[in-house]
């Protein structure tokens, strides 16, 4: 006896000296991703290719714990890891010829699993017993049960009750009913033969579960006992919905993850993308992506990274939501937002759309034509490049760059590097970036990052004034039948959306991003390998897809924007032709919103009353009634008049003077010539004897420009013409004087290069 007691004491001391065992250090766990309504999207594999989902003991039904102990270890709460009575009972059963019974306790089974023991050998069985005693010493019964439920084998590569309940019954463990619990309880004892992976094994499972049900009825009076004999519906349920989305989520965390995704919307939009790309296959359109966001809480409701995740020919596993590409014109609304915020424009401000140079940068419009002049809303919705670049120059490249950075756009170069090309897609952004930025407009200028998990908390940043954000959305949110030059019939679309298209350089990407109801939607079509396709035009290809999706998920209600009461906005009457404050001689007037104290609106100096000689119809030097009468004319600069002419727009010009009035001071009113090239304070590098081009836009009543360099006459040019001249090196002053004596001056530096 002393020897036996000494042996037990030695074993106990050895167990005490061993470090506390880590039950999970050899195991990794899967992740289960759910949508906002609890629908399973995906169960991932663990690092060792198992479906093993950690489930806390409180999420495992009490009945499952009772059934396990009834079936495997009735004395669980009364032993220290090893049950001598169990060994005796197993031996008698074997000697008596009855059913073979295992002598292993739950703790011993856990020890075998955790330490991967071969318990068919004497050494393995001894280590199993010692490890069981060690586990019992360091862990509570609840912790042991939890570990067992999370690592027990349930057939194939399915381990743990959490993964088994999802895969076999498509529901989390806490929702298991009694028949399902019985079916799962009997699997770990013989997982190869009793799992639910096929019909033959399901029959073996049913037989074993039937024996357990009999014992259960004898041991427990349960409200669900009457349902124990109902047919059990099971199968193998391994969904893979929203594959780009779930893989992104699972790369960040494991376990049970409840996301913001809406499986119904995800499925609907996925099917729309599949149909739409199939319809356009003949045009070489095979791939598309879309993201839908709820502006109210920034929840990502749908996330489709490609038209077909499983199609390697289109590189379908590339995530189009996070991929960075040129957005074309899709960022223009935010340049306008900054201009509105700075008071530079209002929705009906007139902007020039004429050939323009900005230093050595000479952008063109997409269609290589020019409108001459148009209001800011038209310039934005018709996506004119020149007005956008002009506004970016005025608001400042750095300010726009900062807005992009603050909105989450990852820019690895300086604002100076990107320059004015930022207005036309010169920076790369992701669909995720665009979705967050357009939602900013709907949220009063407050930026919030996208929300992927149900428990995400967001921090808002005010990046644009609420007034500027509203006016930008207002400018984009026009009645469709008021939009000119739409490439497709949009009048049938029920909803009013604030939307903008984009086409990247060389036709590689077609975009549409916009806001409708409480949603922000961004769609993209293109190729992940960067190949171009003339079909990839935002307004022709992406906009119809945008509206097809919006029609399917919207509520088909009238979405007229109303001005929130707290905004500092008012309406003012303006002269429609000029965008300036209306005067008595404006031919047409209109009302527009402006921001009191911010928006700079001046009296019109384009519309002017001039004296007309009644007899000849020519312009008189003075108003001398009754031989003259006052008439209103618009005095556009020569560059605008030239663009009008090229666009075939007939324009009523002021008539020529009746006689020479150049010495009369009253007629020196109007605009001085605007020097369009070179830019003020620019630095130009020239080789010796090389010339520079001087160009200016004079007022409508001027026909000649006289050029002076450092107060010396360099030459003269007609309106719309260029003067080539060789300048001196160093700092020089250039003066342009029109034939009515009005002048403007710039300073530049000429640097000599060999």
Model-predicted segments: where are they?
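Non-catalytic, structured segments within soluble enzyme domains
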Residues: 12-13, 99, 103-267, 271, ...
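A penicillin-recognizing enzyme superfamily signal
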Residues: 259-282, 292-294, 303, 311-320, ...
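Short pre-catalytic segments that frame enzyme active sites
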Residues: 32, 39-53, 163, 190, ...
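Residue-level preference for non-acidic, small/hydrophobic
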Residues: 38, 68, 110, 144, ...
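Active/ligand-binding-proximal structured segments within catalytic/core domains
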Residues: 59-92, 317-337
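N-terminal type II signal-anchor transmembrane helix
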Residues: 1-36
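Soluble, non-transmembrane domains of envelope/secretory-pathway proteins that act on or interact
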Residues: 1, 12, 34, 220, ...
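Conserved catalytic neighborhood of penicillin-recognizing serine enzymes
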Residues: 93-120, 236-240, 244-248, 296, ...
């Amino acid at each position: 006896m002393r020897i036996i007691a000494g042996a037990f004491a030695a074993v106990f001391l050895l167990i005490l000296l061993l470090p506390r065992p880590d039950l999970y250090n050899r195991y990794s766990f899967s992740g289960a991703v759910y949508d906002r309504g609890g629908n399973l999207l995906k169960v991932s594999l663990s690092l060792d290719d198992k479906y093993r989902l950690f489930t806390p003991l409180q999420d495992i039904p009490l009945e499952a714990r009772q059934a396990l102990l009834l079936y495997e270890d009735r004395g669980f709460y009364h032993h220290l890891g090893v049950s001598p009575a169990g060994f005796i009972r197993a031996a008698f059963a074997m000697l008596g010829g009855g059913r073979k019974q295992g002598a292993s306790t739950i703790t011993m089974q856990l020890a075998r699993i955790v330490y991967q023991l071969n318990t068919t050998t004497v050494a393995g069985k001894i280590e199993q017993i010692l490890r069981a005693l060690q586990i019992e010493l360091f862990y509570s019964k609840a912790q042991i049960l939890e570990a067992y439920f999370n690592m027990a084998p349930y057939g194939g590569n399915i381990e743990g009750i959490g993964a088994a309940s999802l895969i076999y019954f498509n529901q989390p463990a806490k929702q298991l009913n009694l028949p399902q619990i019985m079916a799962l309880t009997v699997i770990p004892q013989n997982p190869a033969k009793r799992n639910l992976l096929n019909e033959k094994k399901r029959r073996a499972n049913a037989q074993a579960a039937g024996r357990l049900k009999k014992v259960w009825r004898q041991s427990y009076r349960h409200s669900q006992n009457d349902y124990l004999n109902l047919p059990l519906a099971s199968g193998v349920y391994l969904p893979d919905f929203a594959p780009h989305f779930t893989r992104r989520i699972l790369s960040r965390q494991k376990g049970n993850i409840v996301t913001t995704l809406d499986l119904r919307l995800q499925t609907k939009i996925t099917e729309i993308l599949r149909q739409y790309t199939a319809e356009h296959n003949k045009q070489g359109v095979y791939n598309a992506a879309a993201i839908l966001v709820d502006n109210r809480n920034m929840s990502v409701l749908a996330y489709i990274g490609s038209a077909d995740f499983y199609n390697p020919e289109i590189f379908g596993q590339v995530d189009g939501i996070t991929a960075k590409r040129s957005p074309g014109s899709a960022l223009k609304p935010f340049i306008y937002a900054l201009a509105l915020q700075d008071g530079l424009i209002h929705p009906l401000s007139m902007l020039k759309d004429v050939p323009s140079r900005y230093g050595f940068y000479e952008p063109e419009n997409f269609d290589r034509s020019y409108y001459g002049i148009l209001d800011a809303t038209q310039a934005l919705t018709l996506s004119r490049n020149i007005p956008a670049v002009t506004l970016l120059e005025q608001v400042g490249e750095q300010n726009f760059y900062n807005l992009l950075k603050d909105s989450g756009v990852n820019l690895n170069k300086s604002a100076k590097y990107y320059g004015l090309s930022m207005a036309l897609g010169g920076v790369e952004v992701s669909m995720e970036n665009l979705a967050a930025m357009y939602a900013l407009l709907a949220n009063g200028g407050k930026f919030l990052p996208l929300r992927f998990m149900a428990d995400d908390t967001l921090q808002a940043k005010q990046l644009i004034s609420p007034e500027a954000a509203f006016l930008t959305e207002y400018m984009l949110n026009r009645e469709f039948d008021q939009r000119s030059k739409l490439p497709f019939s949009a009048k049938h679309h029920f909803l009013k959306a604030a939307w903008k298209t984009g086409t990247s350089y060389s036709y590689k990407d077609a975009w549409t991003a916009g806001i409708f109801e409480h949603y922000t939607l961004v769609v993209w079509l293109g190729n992940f390998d960067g190949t171009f396709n003339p079909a990839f035009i935002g307004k022709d290809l992406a906009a119809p897809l945008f509206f097809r999706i919006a029609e399917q998920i919207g509520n088909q209600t009238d979405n007229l924007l109303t001005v929130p009461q707290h905004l500092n906005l008012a309406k003012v009457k303006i002269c429609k032709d000029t965008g300036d404050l209306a005067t008595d001689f404006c031919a047409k007037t209109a009302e527009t919103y402006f921001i009191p104290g911010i928006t700079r609106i001046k009296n019109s100096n384009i519309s002017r009353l001039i004296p007309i000689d009644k007899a000849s119809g020519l312009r008189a030097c003075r108003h001398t009634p009754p031989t003259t009468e006052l008439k209103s004319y618009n005095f556009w600069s020569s560059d605008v008049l030239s663009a009008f002419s090229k666009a075939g727009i007939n324009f009523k010009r002021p008539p020529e003077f009746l006689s020479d009035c150049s010495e009369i001071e009253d007629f020196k009113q109007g605009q001085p010539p605007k020097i369009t090239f070179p830019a003020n304070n620019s630095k130009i590098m020239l080789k010796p004897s090389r010339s520079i081009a001087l160009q200016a836009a004079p007022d409508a009543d001027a026909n000649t420009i006289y050029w002076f360099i450092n107060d010396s006459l360099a030459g003269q040019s007609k309106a719309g013409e260029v003067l080539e001249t060789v300048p001196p090196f160093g700092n020089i002053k250039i003066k342009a004087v029109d034939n009515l004596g009005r002048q403007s001056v710039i300073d530049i530096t000429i640097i000599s290069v060999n």
